[in-house]
């Protein structure tokens, strides 16, 4: 007995320990249920209201304290404000922690309430209760509720996912266990058909009682809409609001309302994209999401593991995005690819001839040629077929071992003859000297596609004896040349990758002249996703469809970091145990295996292994024919669109009726999968298309042996194979599963070791024979584990890079949210002024450069130095910073007070005379370079005597500078991430270099952003316009009446003013006291529709608004 087995016997295995922990809750639920089921329907609903109130009463003291602190913060100095806001943050965290305590306390009663609600719906056609306002609202849009006088009548049937359903489910004990596990913030692994969707109702209901919102996350929009409609009535019966974000357009009022519901359903991508959109919003009313409280992720493995390798990105056009070289260099690359194909085909022919010889030396030469052909074109079908012959693969692997020895010292002898080298495992392509020569054969410059040694060239330039101006010009030319060549090399590399590593109908499909990515895990099209770094454009060029313009990142986050923001995260799936380590490492999520309600009766058979793919597919077809004759339904799982179409053609030739589900045919997915359990039905599904929909069997089918699962290839992940098996044998139904494998399969080619190859040879494996061998099955599993480790490495690597971005993102998004909401904007602005003061002192005090300090101070803060030269040289940096900040703060306050003082008379006049007509007013404020039209609430601006204008101005400037700086920073971070990969050639860790360099980039970005913000704020004033002509007045009225956005303004309309404060103040006061009509005040905004950017410009030019007067908005 091993140590692990001994410990399991002593303490029980993990699963037993987990269930022991949950059992007391289940016992309490049963006790509570006995009392709850005796209540009337109205009393049952009343219990929910009592529980909701109990939660709010538990945290009312903390909420009152927060309200009190928010009132106190006004008028406090910077240090006191920071202290108060820190207390507010701490109290908000305490509220969440206290709520968890009270939720655990009321869990048995809440679970009993929802279980009994399910029972009442299952056992009664209608439930009659006293009508509330919510019931009346529900009756307007939902047919399962009707109002009869003061009574609300709930039906037990409704439409979900386009189908009429009759409620017939009541929670089992194992589902109560699952619900408790989910409430505790863990992952519940439940077998297919065990009712995961129903399990979720328990923790969703409980946590929704807090009013903080619960997010139920699904893998596709069909499931999110279906589940919200299917489970929604249970929640609505108790007065909870339910909505689904996928039913509404992004940034719409309807979507905002969906997030404000107690329970919100949606897809992982849309939740993530809404978060990014919120962090690009320019007004609080544009925000849709609330704080991230509690999320339950359905098919958690698919969302947190499979989708986690692709970050969510919102991108936009980049300058010169149309100037791309993919189509220009496509003929060069096609020429190289074609030459490689011919070479590798000839190498294979020569290798076969030599290896057939009796001479050992000839055989060795043949083995070398075979290995060379493999390095050049590993996916060549003839090569794959030849490698499955006895002794061939093991011979090639021995050759590989010999040339990889001594750190691949002799590998060049293999690869020099090739044009490029493909490494499938690393997903990389590398041009050889021979390939570069062929590429450049069409050009005059033999180094056309070769990057110059820029460091050596710049070093040589520094040593030249010439004047500084000439050296600078030469340096600029070297850098420009490097930039041009770098883009060429990158374009060619991406085109080569597109040809060598990406295959149509496997990783992507072409539909409607567009290249669409296929999710390798589910076989679904990934709408809106594009390969990054120019790879998508390269594939578009290869497929001769329109090459889309290059884009740049505006906002990005990985799903890992998005879901880690939730206060509490839980998930459910049928298959998570194999990835339990990763789920704990990254998300700190524990996996708990929930026992099945009935024992599993499915028969899982050993893999059947064939030599070639052709034999394997022939055997699959024979098996399908046999099973159909027995009257059993068959679900055939494939790994690509190509294979599903091949099997479909083979079945058509045999006259077998069947349905195909793949990325090209996904519209009727749920409908086809639901029908897949009927007698003699054959369904071919790419990977796990149709996941989330139950396959129900008739009594006749169960008698015949149940649903038969046939896997046509082992997937790279054992988890996906388990998902396919799990489609059969739900709720104790009979069924079977079997996988057909060939030595030509992708997994076997890449990861099957020499041991497998030699074992096959020893077993005397002949063509047409089938093997069912435990040793081989274990070898396949070991190969899968290898790939899983590899994929985990990729995801962890992605996360490590994104963690760097995440810490920066948190700083920027927090500052941005403070500006947007306005509550902490005053404190943030003062902090920014202080940071600029500190940076100025740090930059000049150490070098004792007082003159430089004075000049930079005027540029940054637009004030004279309050510090003399003697004080500058005699005091410590901290004291100097405080002195400078005091003066800067006073100057800033004076300027803001002056703006309020000048603006208020105009605001007051408009409010007094036209408050019934206008709701908002535009106030122009300039920094001397551009004019910002600041939109404010008219009443608020008058009541605060112009102070609210200052707050809106600060918000507008901070948001503008953050967005401009962050967008540019993301572009630089993208470039940095690409450039640091070369560090590995110098035996340095690219991630470490990335961390160091990105910190420096971020520090500089924040410093520049602070300076820009402060420079605008410290120069702010209300401009004094020249009296406009009547035509200009009318023209301006048309535009400005509708727009409160910031805009660039033609400064020729404004007088050139010196920075003489007294003259400036006088001019502004004169402008404020000028009689009405002498210079028209800024026109307020009416409550009417805005001009869309694509609408005709109101000036009458005939151009679109965005191309005319809206160009600079």
Curated annotation (Swiss-Prot):
Record's bilayer topology term: Peripheral membrane protein
Signal peptide: none
Top-level taxonomic group: Bacteria
SUPFAM superfamilies, per the entry: Helical scaffold and wing domains of SecA, P-loop containing nucleoside triphosphate hydrolases, Pre-protein crosslinking domain of SecA
Annotated binding of Zn(2+), by residue: 1097, 1099, 1108-1109
Region feature Disordered, mapped onto this chain: 1042-1113
InterPro entries to which the protein is assigned, alphabetical: Helicase_ATP-bd (IPR014001), Helicase_C-like (IPR001650), P-loop_NTPase (IPR027417), SEC_C_motif (IPR004027), SecA (IPR000185), SecA_CS (IPR020937), SecA_DEAD (IPR011115), SecA_motor_DEAD (IPR014018)
GO CC annotation, single: plasma membrane
Alphabetical list of SMART domains matching this protein: SecA_DEAD, SecA_PP_bind
Top-tier EC class: translocase
Composition bias, Basic residues: 1103-1113
Cofactor note: May bind 1 zinc ion per subunit.
Entry similarity comment: Belongs to the SecA family.
Subunit structure: Monomer and homodimer. Part of the essential Sec protein translocation apparatus which comprises SecA, SecYEG and auxiliary proteins SecDF. Other proteins may also be involved.
The protein's name: Protein translocase subunit SecA
Species, as recorded: Porphyromonas gingivalis (strain ATCC 33277 / DSM 20709 / CIP 103683 / JCM 12257 / NCTC 11834 / 2561)
């Amino acid at each position: 007995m091993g140590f692990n087995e001994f410990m399991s016997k002593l303490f029980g295995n993990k699963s037993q320990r987990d269930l022991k922990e949950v059992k007391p809750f289940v016992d309490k639920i049963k006790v509570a249920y006995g009392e709850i089921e005796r209540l009337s329907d109205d009393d049952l609903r009343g219990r929910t209201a009592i529980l909701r109130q109990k939660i709010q009463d538990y945290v009312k003291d903390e909420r009152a304290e927060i309200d009190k602190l928010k009132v106190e913060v006004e008028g406090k100095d910077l240090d006191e404000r920071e202290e108060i806001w820190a207390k507010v943050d701490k109290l908000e965290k305490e509220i969440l922690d206290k709520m968890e305590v009270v939720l655990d306390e009321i869990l048995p009663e809440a679970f009993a309430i929802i279980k009994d609600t399910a029972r009442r719906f299952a056992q009664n056609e209608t439930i009659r209760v006293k009508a509330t306002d919510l019931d009346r609202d529900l009756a307007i849009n939902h047919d399962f509720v009707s109002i009869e006088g003061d009574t609300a009548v709930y039906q037990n049937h409704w439409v979900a996912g386009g189908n009429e359903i009759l409620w017939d489910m009541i929670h089992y004990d194992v589902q109560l266990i699952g619900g408790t596990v989910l409430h505790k913030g863990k992952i519940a692994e439940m077998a297919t058909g065990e009712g995961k969707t129903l399990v979720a109702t328990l923790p969703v209901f409980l946590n929704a009682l807090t009013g903080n919102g619960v997010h139920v996350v699904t893998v596709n929009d069909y499931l999110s809409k279906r589940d919200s409609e299917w489970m929604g009535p249970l929640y609505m019966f108790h007065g909870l609001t339910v909505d689904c974000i996928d039913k509404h357009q992004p940034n719409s009022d309807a979507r905002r309302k969906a997030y404000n519901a107690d329970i919100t359903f949606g897809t992982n991508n849309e939740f993530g994209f809404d978060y990014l959109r919120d962090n690009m919003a320019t007004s609080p009313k544009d925000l849709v999401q609330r704080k991230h409280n509690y999320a339950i992720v359905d098919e958690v493995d698919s969302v947190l593991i499979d989708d986690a390798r692709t970050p969510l990105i919102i991108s936009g056009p980049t300058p010169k995005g149309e100037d791309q070289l993919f189509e220009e260099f496509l003929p060069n690359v096609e020429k190289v690819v074609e030459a490689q194909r011919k070479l590798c085909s000839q190498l294979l022919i020569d290798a076969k001839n030599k290896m057939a010889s009796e001479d050992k030396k000839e055989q060795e030469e043949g083995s070398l040629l075979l290995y060379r052909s493999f390095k050049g074109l590993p996916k060549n079908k003839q090569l794959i077929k030849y490698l499955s012959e006895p002794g061939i693969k093991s011979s090639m692997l021995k050759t590989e071992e010999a040339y990889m020895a001594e750190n691949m010292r002799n590998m060049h002898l293999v690869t020099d003859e090739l044009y490029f080298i493909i490494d499938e495992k690393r997903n990389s392509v590398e041009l050889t000297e021979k390939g570069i020569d062929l590429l450049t054969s069409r050009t005059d410059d033999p180094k056309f596609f070769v990057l110059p040694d820029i460091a050596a060239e710049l070093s040589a330039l520094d040593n030249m004896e010439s004047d500084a101006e000439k050296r600078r010009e030469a340096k600029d030319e070297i850098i420009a040349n490097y930039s041009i060549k770098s883009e060429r090399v990158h374009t060619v590399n991406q085109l080569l990758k597109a040809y060598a590593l990406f295959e149509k109908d496997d990783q992507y499909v072409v539909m409607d002249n567009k290249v669409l990515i296929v999710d390798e895990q589910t076989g679904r099209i990934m709408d809106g996703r594009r390969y990054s770094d120019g790879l998508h454009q390269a594939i578009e060029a290869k497929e001769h469809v329109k090459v889309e313009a290059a884009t740049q990142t505006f906002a990005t986050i990985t799903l890992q970091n998005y879901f880690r923001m939730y206060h509490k995260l839980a998930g459910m799936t049928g298959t998570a145990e194999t990835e339990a380590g990763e789920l704990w490492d990254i998300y700190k999520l524990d996996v708990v295996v929930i026992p099945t309600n009935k024992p599993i009766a499915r028969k899982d058979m050993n893999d059947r292994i064939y030599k070639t793919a052709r034999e394997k597919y022939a055997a699959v077809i024979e098996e399908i024919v046999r099973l159909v004759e027995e009257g059993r339904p068959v679900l055939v799982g494939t790994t690509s669109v190509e294979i599903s179409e091949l099997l479909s053609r083979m079945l058509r030739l045999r006259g077998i009726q069947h349905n195909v589900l793949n990325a090209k045919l996904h519209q009727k997915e749920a409908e086809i999968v639901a029908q897949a359990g009927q007698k003699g039905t054959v369904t071919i599904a790419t990977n796990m298309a149709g996941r989330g929909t139950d396959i129900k069997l008739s009594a006749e089918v169960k008698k015949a042996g149940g649903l038969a699962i046939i896997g046509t290839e082992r997937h790279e992940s054992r988890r996906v194979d388990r998902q396919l098996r799990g489609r059969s044998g739900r709720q104790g139904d009979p069924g079977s599963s079997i996988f057909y494998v060939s030595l030509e399969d992708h997994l076997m080619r890449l990861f099957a070791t020499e041991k497998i190859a030699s074992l096959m040879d020893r077993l005397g494996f002949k063509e047409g024979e089938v093997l069912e061998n435990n040793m081989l099955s274990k070898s396949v599993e070991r190969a899968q584990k290898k790939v899983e480790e590899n994929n985990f490495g990729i995801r962890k690597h992605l996360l490590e890079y994104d963690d760097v971005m995440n810490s920066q993102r948190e700083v920027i998004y927090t500052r941005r949210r403070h500006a947007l909401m306005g509550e902490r904007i005053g404190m943030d602005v003062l902090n920014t002024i202080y940071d600029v003061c500190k940076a100025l002192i740090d930059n000049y005090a150490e070098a004792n450069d007082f003159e430089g300090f004075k000049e930079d101070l005027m540029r940054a803060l637009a004030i004279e130095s309050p510090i003399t030269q003697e004080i500058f040289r005699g005091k410590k940096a901290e004291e100097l910073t405080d002195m400078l900040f005091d003066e800067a703060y006073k100057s800033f306050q004076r300027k803001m007070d002056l703006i309020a003082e000048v603006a208020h008379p105009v605001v007051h006049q408009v409010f007094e005379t036209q408050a019934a007509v206008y709701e908002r007013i535009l106030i122009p404020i300039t920094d001397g370079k551009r004019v910002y039209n600041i939109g404010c609430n008219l009443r608020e601006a008058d009541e605060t005597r112009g102070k609210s204008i200052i707050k809106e101005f600060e918000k507008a400037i901070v948001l503008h500078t953050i967005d401009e700086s962050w967008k540019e920073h993301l572009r630089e971070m993208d470039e940095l991430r690409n450039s640091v990969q070369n560090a590995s050639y110098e035996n340095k860790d690219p991630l470490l270099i990335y961390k160091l360099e990105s910190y420096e980039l971020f520090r500089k970005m924040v410093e520049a952003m602070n300076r820009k913000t402060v420079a605008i704020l410290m120069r702010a004033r209300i401009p004094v316009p020249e009296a406009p002509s009547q035509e200009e007045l009318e023209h301006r009225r048309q535009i400005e009446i509708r727009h409160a956005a910031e805009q660039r303004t033609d400064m020729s309309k404004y007088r050139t003013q010196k920075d003489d404060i007294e003259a400036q103040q006088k001019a502004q006061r004169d402008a404020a006291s000028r009689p009405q009509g002498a210079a028209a005040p800024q026109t307020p905004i009416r409550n009417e529709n805005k001009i869309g950017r694509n609408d005709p410009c109101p000036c009458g030019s005939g151009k679109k608004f965005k191309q005319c007067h809206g160009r600079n908005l």
